[in-house]
Amino acid sequence: MFQCLEPERNEEAGLVYVREKGKLSVIGSHSSELRTRPCRLFSKGFSVELCGKQEDTSKHRQKPFIFTYTKEGSLRYSAKSLFTLTLELISDNIQYVDSLMGFPDQIAEKLFTAAEAKQKFYAPCSGLMALRKFTEAYGDLVLSSLCLRGRYLLVSERLEEIKSFQCLHSLDLSCCKLGDEHELLAHLSSDPMSSLTELYLKDNCLSNIGIQKMTASVRVLGRGLDKLKVLDLSSNPGITDRGVCFLFGFKLLKFLDLSDTSIQDPSGTLKKIETKIGLVLSKKSIFQFDHTNCRTQGWAEQLLEQWESYILSAIKPKDTLKSRNAAQQFYGKEKKQIPSDSGTFTLPAPVVQKQTHLQFFRPKEQKDPDSSNSEKRRHSTKRTGADCVQEDCSIAPSTKRPRVTLTSSDWDLLNSY
């Protein structure tokens, strides 16, 4: 009876588990060991992708390291310097910089090149703001000479950017079709253009009214283009003898070109120019008016080329002429050609004006001690209005800070970070 009750007790009690030496076993079962699988949080094929803040995928993000190859041909990873990373960060946000006054010129040039490579000067509003940060702080380093000869499309499309350039020494606006009412002509008499020493306005449809507006600040206030030494007004038929009188305010003028204008009394005009300014007529062509040495110089030299190429690429060539001819041939409306022998009407020949050579230069002055002493006495007793204005300008403190330059040791220290 004991044997019969034992299996019933075993069934009621259930399985008995025993752990021995870290192994779990069941008493009285055929499988002495239970295989326990490790608990996995994820399956083998599970992968995790970290998604951060969504950014603009159209912009290529530069990685903070550089790929280079060694002499053996193996690929080498080198991290960018802290200076390079900082330069890229500032160039990406150059329009938000308050001012660049006081920064060294070498760093500013690298920053300008980096911003130009990122096309930060192309945007209509932010590009102009970024460009003004450099022109206000560095002046003629951005551009000292600007040649816009025949580039009237660039003048019309980038007028505000051109007006932002300060401390220019040479400006060539020949063949730009400005006219008397152009905004850039009025800008020439402003204070930012007072550093101009060479100005070329050949073939711009100027008249006496435009010359009067351009020289108003010099004649009345004694400032503006008061440092001008070379002036080219040739090929402007609207300039007459009356317009020449407005040029007498340029006391430092050394070279003047009035060729192909509408001067009716050359002999009388020559006498006025010689007595008022001290210029005499040159029998030979003056090399200053050959336009061979005039070119764009400064940090923004490549920027102007990119502007012009962008404007020219936007202008698509007109292909309507071929389609128009094809349509005329299809409908049988070809253009009638008038035979040469049956000409009942002939166009008059264009009137060719006689070219006049009127180039003036200042001869070398011979020093006369008596005349110099008398001139000094006259200036000591009487002060002119222009002298007062110049004295006031000299007393006024300059707004621009002195430029800071880095030495070779400073560059070594900067590149070591």
Curated annotation (Swiss-Prot):
Region of interest: Disordered: 360-390
Pfam families documented for this protein: LRR_6 (PF13516)
Gene3D superfamilies: Ribonuclease Inhibitor (3.80.10.10)
LRR repeat residue numbers: 167-188, 195-215, 227-248, 252-273
Biased amino acid composition, Basic and acidic residues: 362-375
Recorded superkingdom: Eukaryota
Keyword entries, A-Z: Leucine-rich repeat, Repeat
Family: Belongs to the LRRC42 family.
Protein name: Leucine-rich repeat-containing protein 42
Lineage: Eukaryota, Metazoa, Chordata, Craniata, Vertebrata
